[in-house]
Amino acid sequence: ITTRLSAAHNAESIESDLYEVTRPTVVLFGMSKKAELRKSLDPLMAELSMDRMFPKVVFTEPMSGRNPAVTVEELSEVMEDYGIGYVPSKVEKDPHKAFEIAGSMAKDLGVDLLVIGSVYLVGDLLNYVVERDGLDLWEVLTAH
């Protein structure tokens, strides 16, 4: 499966990255606490509610960062508040396990995977994959 990692963590960057998705995609989302949480989540919730491009979402919590993670319970509550509790979702606090779950979902559905919401989540998962697969980070990392 094609997996895309994005450090988008505010409304504008999340909206931009979601707009660039051209194939059905499972979303793995986790972020650090911020003052305007709901404003930051507006683009994600809007896309999940009206766009069939995102058939499933997995919520997780970054392990590192300056601020504490937004809990998976809080993310699920926001989803319910937006009236989109019908979108198939899964919650897993451990981002490593969440990554495996989201990857399996994407593989089973034959769709892509987008990891988004926090630079710390991206860093946690890059470290995990490098260690899990015995990779050299500098050999596999590409920038665009």
Each predicted region: which residue ranges?
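Structural beta-sheet core signal
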Residues: V27-F29, F59, V115
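Active-site-proximal loop/hinge segments that shape catalytic or ion-binding/gating pockets
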Residues: S118
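Short, active-site-adjacent cap segments at secondary-structure transitions
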Residues: A35, L121-G123
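Nucleotide phosphate-binding/pyrophosphate-handling subdomain across enzymes
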Residues: I1-F54
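C-terminal helical cap/extension that packs against the catalytic core
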Residues: T3, L41-D112
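Short, flexible loop segments at boundaries between secondary-structure elements
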Residues: P62-G65, G134-H144
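Short secondary-structure boundary/capping segments
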Residues: L44, V130-R132
